[in-house]
């Protein structure tokens, strides 16, 4: 079934210029709808984890998400008292009280999750936004004004602090999703974008910005890397010294790995079980 779906989606992607809400084969519509539905219930994911820091990205699923926008027109929608004009309905608006209880998710107004995202049991959505294709793991807190971008992968027992931005893949188009692995703490107003991977058990301090071109400097080893924070790292924002060709000194922004996570760090960033009953 999955292989057949992939073949239909890949073929439709190559012919996407000729696909619209009024012109698309039924098998393409059905295939795209099936993918969105499976993303919505967590049976499909844009990326799957093989080991720490190692992920397989399923490009055909991302293509299906993009094709879904071509297959629908904007329409007026209602989710409770929230009115909007869009192509994608919200995730929870049609659920009954019992269905919401069974989901195990707590949703604080005016949090919004789009259909096609998955929110696992025990997760908490404070007033925040989760885009289509995203995956939010068990016990994760998406705090106030945090945003989880399209197709982003957020692990279990993660804390996304207030105002955190996790980048999406749809615009600008990215090769792979931004990934925050299990048991990470992302400090307030931090931004992780452009398919960067934050490996498990890491802590980002407040106001850390990491994209693919951001130098990630390890204070202990002196090494500089890009696009990935190693497991168990504690990262703060900082600067690295540079020189112009004429010898003039200046500095550029960098993310600095200052140490590995220890008991003191954990005591300051541990999740509160009282909020998850």
From Swiss-Prot:
Its main location: cytoplasm. Its EC number is 2.3.1.117. Substrate binds at residues 106, 143. This is 2,3,4,5-tetrahydropyridine-2,6-dicarboxylate N-succinyltransferase. It is found in: Cytoplasm. PROSITE patterns: HEXAPEP_TRANSFERASES. One of its GO terms (biological process) is lysine biosynthetic process via diaminopimelate. Pathway: Amino-acid biosynthesis; L-lysine biosynthesis via DAP pathway; LL-2,6-diaminopimelate from (S)-tetrahydrodipicolinate (succinylase route): step 1/3. Coiled coil: none annotated. It comes from the Bacteria. InterPro entries: DapD_Trfase_Hexpep_rpt_fam, Hexapep, Hexapep_transf_CS, THP_succinylTrfase_dom1, THP_succinylTrfase_N_sf, Trans_hexapeptide_repeat, Trimer_LpxA-like_sf. The gene is dapD. The keyword Cytoplasm applies. Homotrimer. Belongs to the transferase hexapeptide repeat family. Pfam families: Hexapep_2, THDPS_N_2. It catalyses: (S)-2,3,4,5-tetrahydrodipicolinate + succinyl-CoA + H2O = (S)-2-succinylamino-6-oxoheptanedioate + CoA.
